Amino acid sequence: MQKMKYSSQYKQLVLDLSWTSLEGLPKDNRWVKLGDSLPWDKIEQIYNNRLNNKHGGAGNKSARIIIGALLIKHKMNLSDRETIQAISENPYMQYMLGLSEFTPRPVFDPSLFVTIRKRLGEEAFNDMSESLLKLEVKQAEEKAREQKEQENDDSDEKHGSNVATSVTDQQSPQQEGTSHQGILKVDATCSDAEMRFPTDLDLLHDGVEIVDRVITRLCKINKLPLPNTHLKEIHSKYLNVIKLRSKPKKKIKACMDYLLTKLYRNIVTFLNMAGKESNTLFNTLKPHDRQLFMTVLKMYHQQKDMFVKGVHQCDHRIVSIFQPHVRPIVRGKAKAKVEFGGKIGASIVKGYTFIDHHSWEAYNECDDLMRHLRNYKKRFGYLPKKFEGDKIYMNRTNRRILRLLKIEIGGKPLGRPSKDQLTKEYQMEMAKNVGERNEIEATFGTGKRVYNANDIRAKLPDTGKSWTAACYFAKNVMKFLRGLLHDLFGTLLFLMERGFNLVMFEFQNLLVAKNLIL
């Protein structure tokens, strides 16, 4: 029997890359919609104000390219290099960045992301989010005005005027002339830094390795004899304890005593070399090495003091030698009682998140009340009508301030419950306040789970703050697009009520719903 000749059915496809113009891209793509909808002029103005290069320096990249790349990075949870690679492979992303033609070349070097994070802080991202919120309010006002004009042409002019007036009042409260408008919701959380869980043994062992590395580099640069730091012996003793399944306290304490002794010996060796030979030997090291050594020296004093006193806490405790600005933040949550990162105080206005306070040190968020109120008035020109926050915000001092400012307090009053608080209407009102306040808890969950706000990979204090702010700015941009989608469906319902044929409506614009929700 003759065997059949096998031939593969899968042929290599040939890509036709003859097209270069991006004008013919479909408008229902989410990146195309982003490029057509965002207020790039306002964003470019905010970005250029942070450059401080009006009178000198090379020309900068377009703000649309920079901010658009940041949005892609945090929306897709990509690294700096992968973001540039994804943009080079995707014409829709290049359209959002404002490019007129497709190009496979990188739009800029990935190292520029670090410079951008150093330039832009949480204030810049808050200003951009504010511009999105004001644009959404402006679009809602224009939509209400168009509906009012359309309804005025109908026979039922009186009913249409009342409806349009109510819509306009809801969307543009500042026109009413009152000094209190809107609801301000505040809360605090912790943005975790990407770092190893700190233990005393790990910190001391890292300190020994860093001092040995600094001594080796100092001797190599200045051609000095290399002293014996006993690194292999120290590493062996450390592994004998750290690899134990159950670590007795006596062995941990003995290992800490040993590491403290050896670390002190190596520090003294380095100081003798840098001081006796010449006063300028220390400056021959790189700034990063000098900073690491000073951090190890400070960490040694903290660990030695806690070891002698038999305690496990101290002020400004270092938990990472490579990120000395990170502090332990006591949270008391079920998942983790202590988190390591920056503590942020955020406020929410109409679904948009603003970071009003970012600190690497632990602080009491109840002291941020006036900060939130000042920022709210600075952004919108009036104080909030209602303030909602956790119990920690509702102490006697803050309640007194809110009463003096004539701001409604959303929450239960202090003291024992009165008879009025036992009524069904009161309980329903309190349940409503709790539901409204849960929005900011959901915002933190979305920011951490979707936009990686709990995995800050930037290693510097300023870049870490910028990373956190960029995560919530990306969330605000998605909120802006969902608002556009809501307006499209609102327009559809309005046209259906007025008797328009659905076929005449631009139904293709509604197909963007799937992409906007992602």
Where are the regions a protein language model picked out?
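Electropositive, glycine- and tryptophan-enriched low-complexity nucleic-acid-binding patches
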Residues: 333-379
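Short, conserved catalytic/metal-binding motifs centered on acidic residues
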Residues: 29, 69, 83-87, 109-113, ...
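Basic, amphipathic alpha-helical segments enriched in Lys/Arg and hydrophobic/aromatic residues
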Residues: 290-295, 300-310, 428-518
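Short, basic/hydrophobic alpha-helical segments
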Residues: 72, 219, 368-386
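Active-site- or DNA-interface-adjacent structural scaffold in DNA-acting proteins
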Residues: 100, 104-323
